[in-house]
Amino acid sequence: MRHTLPIAPQFYVTAPQACPYLDGRRERKLFTALQGDQAETLNNSLSKQGFRRSQNVLYRPSCTDCAACLSARIRVADFAPRRGHKRISRRNEHLFRNPRSAWATEEQYALFRTYLDTRHADGGMADMDVFEFAAMIEETPVKTRVIEYRDRTDGDDLAAVCLTDILDDGLSLVYSFFAPELQKNSLGTYVILDHIALAQEAGLPYVYLGYWVPGSTKMGYKASFPALEVHVNGDWQDIGDPADYDTQTHPLSTDPIAQQVAQITLPDLRGENGRSDGLRGFSDGP
């Protein structure tokens, strides 16, 4: 019989570093560990509040003078593909979906390296070796799949890969990459379109895309999807006109970290034997 009390999640803050999306900005993240029997429950709850998973950590931006990064998701039931989306789907009809367990392969890593070297050679992941890649894929305490996309007309060659979490209300695209020589096929957009179809098949209402950043050319394509919602001031709302979003934020408009943590709604992590006191932990990270 368990007599110890479950420990409430502890939240930490990363040290500021250069923003990968907007020049001249500094990013900072609020994060907590994702572990134990209740990891899936916590992941489901915090994903609805704008958090993202990276291995066994959940995080969301908590920058001191910027709030440009907005968590984005698509309402599957309301999604109607635009003409350009239909063209992209037809352009990739030769691909087939191949879901796998979260287990890294040498073939996936080879494609990952080619993708980084071609498109993100100066990015934060550029130096990842095969062991770090395996950790990114395999270190998951929640329900995760690797969705491969293979070319049936070319010996089933690997064309794209998406690391996908299965939430209680949707699919979350954790990270995706594709063959750079197929860039003209808009594979990044195609992977999202296929995940919308996959969510429809599974009866899941949302597809989580990660962060949309107004003013960032890297993230602009996400705003092209109909039925897109963004997480703003604690609530999900229809994106409306992307041009209405301002990347400039007054420094005093950002809540202190302790207040941000206090506003997080934690799930009931009590098991059959034990109770949670509901307290939130907070510590400054290194």
From Swiss-Prot:
One term of GO molecular function: arginyl-tRNA--protein transferase activity
Keywords of the record: Acyltransferase, Cytoplasm, Transferase
Keyword Transferase: yes
GO cellular component: cytoplasm
Subcellular location: Cytoplasm
Entries under Pfam families matching the protein: ATE_C (PF04377), ATE_N (PF04376)
Primary site of residence: cytoplasm
Reactions that this protein is recorded to catalyse: N-terminal L-glutamyl-[protein] + L-leucyl-tRNA(Leu) = N-terminal L-leucyl-L-glutamyl-[protein] + tRNA(Leu) + H(+); N-terminal L-aspartyl-[protein] + L-leucyl-tRNA(Leu) = N-terminal L-leucyl-L-aspartyl-[protein] + tRNA(Leu) + H(+)
EC number: 2.3.2.29
InterPro entries with a match to the protein in the record: Acyl_CoA_acyltransferase, Asp_Glu_LeuTrfase, N-end_Aminoacyl_Trfase, N-end_Aminoacyl_Trfase_C, N-end_Aminoacyl_Trfase_N
Enzyme class at the top of the EC tree: transferase
Entry keyword Endoplasmic reticulum: no
UniProt family annotation: Belongs to the R-transferase family. Bpt subfamily.
Function (record text): Functions in the N-end rule pathway of protein degradation where it conjugates Leu from its aminoacyl-tRNA to the N-termini of proteins containing an N-terminal aspartate or glutamate.
Entries under PANTHER family matching the protein: ARGININE-TRNA-PROTEIN TRANSFERASE 1, ARGINYL-TRNA--PROTEIN TRANSFERASE 1
UniProt-recorded name of the protein: Aspartate/glutamate leucyltransferase
Originating organism: Jannaschia sp. (strain CCS1)
